[in-house]
């Protein structure tokens, strides 16, 4: 028998339960299992200098843990894990300078009381595949209430190195009667099962077996049906009691218990449970009694489930129904945003009913009942939805242009965005400015690398990072790159001598505001303009380290290369329909061809540059400009102001007079 431990709880007293051949009472024979104090030997194959400390009191801080561990070994750092409100999560990590210090601290301080609560220390395992594999993990149930973490640890430590040991507790700190022990090796776990399963621990026979996940426990590997002995019965007549329940179900097998659930007044709640001794009897009762009439009621008989199982089953059922509904409405459900505040469900249905049979329309509201600016419209078939998308996308509703797209599930949208962002972040292969004859010129790169000899190589980049690199008005096939903005450090020493290859950047707040309003961008302060690669030597800023240029951001698109042949102006509805099915490159070209002659009426001298700047705006706003001459005139005026402010007094490329 092991001596009492520091916490006042003795290690579990274990005896075999051996039936006597001559008597009905069992004889308890002590088992000679050595229970020394736990000695942990450092495993040099997998050195670990970090410890996990669990079961911490909420008041425990880093300082408390540091003061506790510093007397045993040299502590490098301590971190108590907290939630977003800075409340302790009940565990911490302690880092040491070497694995031997960590093992020594674990051996000396494991289950030491801190704020009257023993702390549970084990090696920190950062590999989730090892932690969650279940290898070497055993389950112990029917534990006596007096057995705590330390007693369980000392009971099982003689079989091998323990990685984790825990007795399950309720919110009040009382034992739930079961626990888990994870060994470093599978052999140690098997030895503990062979020796301790069925033994008496503190006068209670315990079950010790391999840990099996909840999802796997309900099913046997060899049988497709769940294993169960407990049967749930509902829709019972009120006059049915336990005796009648036993009599009704007794024909299927031996019943170990039967109960009818009652309220506080003793009246039947019309459901109960029947527990059989064997699974075959329970399965037979479910098969033959489910749906049988008993009096005026039709019985429901099924396998008794835990609340967590029922919730999981209902969740799967509702999720499958949601997926089925979505698949039925695939392509027929529209997502709308930029809705005017005056639009409600009825008005939304009224607006879209002319394009087909609207099965549902919904404007999303905040908790105060105000519109969140987006909603959904569902049609009976995809053809009607596509017709509505073509006709209504970009249309002015109230004071806002409407944006419409096919609705996506959150999971699909997230997967699409993750794939897009991973493509953006992935470094592309280095390639020069070569391109197939007659094909579109690739857009300007995000980074340009310039070697000592000045030869430039441009990595290809995917679409979607601030501009459309596959097509840029202002770049004819075969031409070099157009205008770019090159960031430079804001705080630096004044430089002497001429700066080559740069226009003077804007320096006042008004210009930044106009640029943001016009182009819907927020360019970082400290940008200077570089006109092509021909100005100056290599187009290099002397403030940038030689050999590497910082990220290059495109200036407003120069539309000088848009075909000057006057394309016939299309009605907005027809143009919107064409844009919906066009690729991004064709979409920009089509918008440019329609916008160019409209801008030319207001500003024939700088029509190409102004058109390029306007093409940086959202498609819905461009369509609005085409419909509203006053709005177009205002935007053209803003664009000219931005161009006028950004021009150098000594530059005459734009044809502005500095005295204008």
UniProtKB/Swiss-Prot annotation:
SMART domains: PolyA, RRM, RRM_1. Residues 49-126, 136-213, 229-306, 332-409 form the RRM domain. PROSITE patterns: PABC, RRM. GO terms for cellular component: cytoplasm; nucleus. The keyword Repeat applies. Signal peptide: none annotated. Expressed predominantly in immature flowers. Detected in tapetum and pollen. Strongly expressed in immatures siliques. Its main location: cytoplasm. It is found in: Cytoplasm; Nucleus. Pfam families: MLLE, RRM_1. The keyword Cytoplasm applies. GO terms for molecular function: RNA binding. GO terms for biological process: mRNA processing; nuclear-transcribed mRNA catabolic process, nonsense-mediated decay; regulation of nuclear-transcribed mRNA poly(A) tail shortening; regulation of translation. Keywords: Cytoplasm, Nonsense-mediated mRNA decay, Nucleus, Repeat, RNA-binding, Translation regulation. Residues 571-648 form the PABC domain. A.thaliana contains 8 PABP genes. Binds the poly(A) tail of mRNA. Appears to be an important mediator of the multiple roles of the poly(A) tail in mRNA biogenesis, stability and translation. In the cytoplasm, affects both translation and mRNA decay. Inhibits the polyadenylated RNA degradation by the Rrp41p 3'-->5' exonuclease in vitro. Binds with the 5'UTRs of PAB2, PAB3 and with a lower affinity with the 5'UTR of PAB5. Belongs to the polyadenylate-binding protein type-1 family. This is Polyadenylate-binding protein 3. It comes from Arabidopsis thaliana.
């Amino acid at each position: 028998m092991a001596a009492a431990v520091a916490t006042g709880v003795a290690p579990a007293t274990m005896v075999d339960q051996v039936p006597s051949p001559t008597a009905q009472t069992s004889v308890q024979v002590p088992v000679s299992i050595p229970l020394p104090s736990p000695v942990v030997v450092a495993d040099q194959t997998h050195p670990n200098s970090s410890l996990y400390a669990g079961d911490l009191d909420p008041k425990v801080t880093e300082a408390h843990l540091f003061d506790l561990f510093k007397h045993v070994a040299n502590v490098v750092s301590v971190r108590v894990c907290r939630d977003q409100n800075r409340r302790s999560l009940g565990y911490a990590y302690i880092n040491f300078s070497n694995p031997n210090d960590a093992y020594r601290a674990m051996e000396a301080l494991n289950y030491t009381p801190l704020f009257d609560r023993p702390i549970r220390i084990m090696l920190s395992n950062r590999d989730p595949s090892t932690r969650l594999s279940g290898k070497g993990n055993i389950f112990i149930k029917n534990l006596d209430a007096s057995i705590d973490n330390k007693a369980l640890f000392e009971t099982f430590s003689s079989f091998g190195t323990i990685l984790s040991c825990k007795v399950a507790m309720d919110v009040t700190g009382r034992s739930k009667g079961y626990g888990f022990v994870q060994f470093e090796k599978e052999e140690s776990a098997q030895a503990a099962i062979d020796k301790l399963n069925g033994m008496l621990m503190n006068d209670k026979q315990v079950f010790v077996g391999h840990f099996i996940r909840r999802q796997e426990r309900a099913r046997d590997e060899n049988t497709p049906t769940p294993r169960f002995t407990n049967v749930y019965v509902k829709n019972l007549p009120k006059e049915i009691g336990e005796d009648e329940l036993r009599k009704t179900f007794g024909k299927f097998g031996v019943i170990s218990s039967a109960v009818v659930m009652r309220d506080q007044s003793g009246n039947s709640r019309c459901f109960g449970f029947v527990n059989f001794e064997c699974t075959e009897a329970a399965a037979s009762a479910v098969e033959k009694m489910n749906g049988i009439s008993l009096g005026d009621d039709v019985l429901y008989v099924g396998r008794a489930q835990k609340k967590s199982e029922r919730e999981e089953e209902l969740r799967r059922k509702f999720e499958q129904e949601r997926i089925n509904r979505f698949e039925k409405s695939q392509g027929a459900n529209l997502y709308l945003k930029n809705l005017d505040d005056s639009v409600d469900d009825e008005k939304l249905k009224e607006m879209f009913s002319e394009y087909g049979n609207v099965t549902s329309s919904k404007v999303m509201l905040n908790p105060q009942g105000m519109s969140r600016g987006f909603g959904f419209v569902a049609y009976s078939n995809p053809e009607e939805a596509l017709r509505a998308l073509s006709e209504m996308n970009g249309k002015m509703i109230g004071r806002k242009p409407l944006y419409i797209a096919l609705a996506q599930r959150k999971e699909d949208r997230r997967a699409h965005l993750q794939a897009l962002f991973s493509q953006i972040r992935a470094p592309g292969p280095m390639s020069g400015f070569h391109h197939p004859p007659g094909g579109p010129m690739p857009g300007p790169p995000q980074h340009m690398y310039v070697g000592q000899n000045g030869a430039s190589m441009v990595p290809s980049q995917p679409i979607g990072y601030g501009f459309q690199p596959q097509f840029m008005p202002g770049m004819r096939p075969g031409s070099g790159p157009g205008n770019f903005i090159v960031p430079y450090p804001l705080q630096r020493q004044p430089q002497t001598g001429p700066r080559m290859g740069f226009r003077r950047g804007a320096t006042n707040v008004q210009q930044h505001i106009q640029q943001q309003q016009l182009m819907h961008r927020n360019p970082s302060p400290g940008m200077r303009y570089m006109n092509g690669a021909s100005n100056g030597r290599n187009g290099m800023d002397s403030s940038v380290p030689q050999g590497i240029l910082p990220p290059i951001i495109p200036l407003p698109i120069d539309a000088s290369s848009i075909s000057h042949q006057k394309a016939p102006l299309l009605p907005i509805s027809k143009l919107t329909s064409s844009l919906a099915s066009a690729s991004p490159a064709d979409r920009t070209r089509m918008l440019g061809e329609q916008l160019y002659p409209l801008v030319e009426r207001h500003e024939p001298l700088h029509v190409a540059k102004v058109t390029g700047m306007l093409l940086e705006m959202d498609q819905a706003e461009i369509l609005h400009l085409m419909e509203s001459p006053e709005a177009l005139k205002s935007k053209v005026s803003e664009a000219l102001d931005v161009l006028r402010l950004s021009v150098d007094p000594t530059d005459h490329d734009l044809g502005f007079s500095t005295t204008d």
